[in-house]
């Protein structure tokens, strides 16, 4: 049987603008801009700013009461799960759905300027899963974190196949920075210097719509 729980995050988070709330907000903003708290000696400060201790205690209590066997999270939630893992009864798995660079090198996205936190908390998970051998290599090379590779399975098979002679590329995506639209367009421009008969069709919507169509 499959049971779906809809959890109201407001039950766990205090959003009132208290001095502590303002301090945590300031820490996150300063770190995102300058990386000043991205040091091992400041891990407790940055961790509390991202995921306050009182909030963590509420989540540990709730998750343990559910008697889960395994808890799986993705993206930035994997770091939070790592903070909870030592106090949870369940096995814990973090699973990233983008490349290493997409999580760590894109400004203000996912793990931007949080390398020291990752080094402390991701190893506390029972497993941390990445999508490719390149990601596994980079986590080990840059952060000395061991990961496990599981390639996303193909979710569907299409009976209709493209005609390679049509000279058209098709990209379907959200128009957001993290999807690498700028890299795609730069790559296509370089490609066209060698063969200008090809066409690139982009389907989607998002925050970068005006920049893409300009």
Residue positions per predicted region:
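Short, structured helix-loop element that forms part of the nucleotide-activated donor/catalytic region
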Residues: 2, 137-138, 201-214
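Conserved nucleotide-sugar phosphate-binding/catalytic loop shared by glycosyltransferases and other
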Residues: 2-42
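Membrane-proximal helix-turn-helix segments that form the acceptor-binding/catalytic region
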Residues: 57-64, 96, 109-128
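Short His-centered aromatic/hydrophobic patch
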Residues: 73-78, 96
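Donor nucleotide-sugar binding/catalytic pocket of nucleotide-sugar-dependent glycosyltransferases
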Residues: 91, 100-101, 117-158
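Short hydrophobic "strand-cap" motifs at the C-terminus of beta-strands
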Residues: 131, 150-153, 169-174, 178, ...
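Nucleotide-sugar donor-binding and catalytic loop/hinge architecture
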Residues: 156-168, 192-194
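A conserved mid-protein helix/loop that constitutes part of the nucleotide-sugar donor-binding site
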Residues: 167, 171-190, 207-210
């Amino acid at each position: 049987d499959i049971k779906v729980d809809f959890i109201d995050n407001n039950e766990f988070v205090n959003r009132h603008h208290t001095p502590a709330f303002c301090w945590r907000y300031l820490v996150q903003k300063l770190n995102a801009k300058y990386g000043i708290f991205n040091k091992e000696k400041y891990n407790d400060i940055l961790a509390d700013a991202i995921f306050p201790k009182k909030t963590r205690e509420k989540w540990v209590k709730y998750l343990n009461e559910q008697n889960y066997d395994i808890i799986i999270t993705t993206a930035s939630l994997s770091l939070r799960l790592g903070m909870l893992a030592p106090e949870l009864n369940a096995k814990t798995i973090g699973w990233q759905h983008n490349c290493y660079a997409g999580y760590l090198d894109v400004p203000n996205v996912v793990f931007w300027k949080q390398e020291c936190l990752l080094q402390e908390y991701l190893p506390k998970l029972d497993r941390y899963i990445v999508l490719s051998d390149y990601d596994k290599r980079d986590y080990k090379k840059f952060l000395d974190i061991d990961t496990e590779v599981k390639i996303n399975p193909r979710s569907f098979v299409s009976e209709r196949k493209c005609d390679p002679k049509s000279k058209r590329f098709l990209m379907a995506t959200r128009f957001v920075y993290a999807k690498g639209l700028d890299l795609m367009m730069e790559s296509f421009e370089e490609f066209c210097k060698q063969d200008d008969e090809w066409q690139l069709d982009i389907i989607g919507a998002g925050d970068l719509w005006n920049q893409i169509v300009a």
